[in-house]
């Protein structure tokens, strides 16, 4: 809460400067410049074996069709198979869970029951009801937390094959990802916090470091000295 932050930060700075002490304060960088949120790309999955790619594309194509039937946009892209050429690098997006999406578990189950049978279709519906492929588009960019790297491509305990590969056929959980809407909310809060920090730096005559601008420059080309 920006108001709580303003109250706590103001109290802290007032206490630290009560005896006439001077110092330096820095603001807070945007998460879009912090390596913890940017080091893992949205498409770290290499080209898949042809059979796996075909199987998943059929499944995700069926779900996209169910989405279209519900007048909802598609959530899955066509996955790329490994072409066997070591000179080329294929990349596929992560499969993630987005809790902001309408849950279409029931629609998926109904659409796939004639093909997969009730139990399997029910399971598929339960794990893909709010699943989608991660986006790298500017307007809808997802950010994958660095801690997620350790689980990408591993097997989800208790999930049956072939629906158990995390980030490929089993969705990364919501707490491993910042969606575009969540990133926008964090930016709004960061702007409010930084306004408080700058105002207090000015009122208390403290030196101010714009860490947000500096890290943004590092993230977008780097800092250049003497050249």
Where are these regions (language model features)?
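Mobile, glycine-rich extracellular loop/lid and propeptide segments
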Residues: 1-12, 21-30, 208, 216, ...
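Acidic, Ser/Thr/Gly/Pro-rich low-complexity segments that form flexible
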Residues: 31-203, 211-227
